[in-house]
């Protein structure tokens, strides 16, 4: 497995600030979904193993996704969930319009951000400190049912936001999760190749929303972007959001959550099924 340089999550961004937090769920406490979505039920009755990678550049995380996805297709590993924060980067999907990136190359260098073209669906989005990015590497029972998979991701985000007192939902005709139908809380962009998913979701937790001034988020001009911190009026502990989102995704997929310690992934090719 590739060696990737990591920094502890939370070393950048507002999540280190003092905050009023919801009750921390017990490790053995079952997750109860707040949304009305039924589990995706991936069909193999396996576990969802969580890997917290900390803060990492986009490129190495993308390479790691591809490597793990190939191992998953070969049944050498079970389903994985990568949780990361990225250094500032704007990414654009296969069908995206590069005119939605407003910053020039010189401006990107000035603000210290990358621009990367990727193989997911969707348009342009931002990743950076204070944002929780989740990359499920899972085998779908029905690879053609991409819409249901995306709705499962949306349900998990809605449930997670509810756990912190933020009421969020879907907006007809648009992907992602929204607050009051006007403010985008989370973006989704995925790829399914030979039945296994890559890419995933980006949930604004304590994100500095000024980064979004350099782009037209997802190509949508008439909506705002928000974060849990903005909606609540205070910063939120990233670790708690990671725990709730992991449980929500496992519930949405119909899998058993099996977290592993923070840090580098385990040995490549190790069996987890």
PLM regions and their residue ranges:
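A structural signal for short, well-ordered beta-strand segments
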Residues: 134-136, 175, 188-190, 201-205, ...
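Flexible, glycine/charged-enriched surface loops at secondary-structure junctions
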Residues: 167-169, 254-263
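Generic non-transmembrane alpha-helical segments
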Residues: 156-164, 244-255
């Amino acid at each position: 497995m590739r060696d990737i340089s990591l920094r502890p999550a939370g070393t950048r961004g507002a999540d280190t600030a003092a905050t009023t937090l919801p009750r921390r769920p017990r490790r053995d406490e079952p997750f109860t979904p707040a949304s009305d979505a039924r589990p995706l039920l991936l069909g193999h009755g396996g576990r969802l193993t969580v890997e917290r990678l900390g803060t990492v550049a986009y490129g190495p995380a993308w390479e790691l996704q591809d490597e793990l996805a190939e191992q998953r297709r070969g049944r050498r590993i079970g389903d994985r969930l990568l949780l990361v924060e990225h250094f500032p980067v704007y990414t654009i999907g296969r069908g995206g319009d590069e005119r939605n990136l407003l910053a020039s190359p010189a401006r990107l260098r000035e603000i210290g951000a990358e621009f990367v073209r990727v193989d997911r669906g969707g348009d342009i989005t931002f990743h950076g400190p204070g944002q929780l990015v989740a990359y499920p590497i899972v085998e779908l029972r029905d690879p053609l049912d991409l819409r249901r998979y995306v709705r499962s991701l949306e349900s998990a985000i809605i449930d997670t936001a509810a756990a912190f007192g933020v009421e969020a939902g879907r907006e007809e005709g648009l992907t992602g999760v929204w607050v009051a139908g006007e403010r985008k809380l989370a973006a989704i962009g995925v790829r399914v190749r030979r039945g296994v998913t890559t890419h995933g979701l980006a949930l604004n937790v304590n994100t500095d929303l000024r980064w979004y001034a350099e782009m037209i988020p997802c190509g949508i001009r008439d909506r705002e972007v928000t974060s849990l911190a903005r909606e609540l009026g205070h910063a939120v502990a990233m670790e708690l959001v990671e725990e709730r989102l992991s449980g929500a995704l496992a519930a949405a997929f119909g899998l058993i959550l099996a977290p592993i310690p923070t840090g580098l992934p385990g040995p490549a090719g190790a069996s987890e099924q």
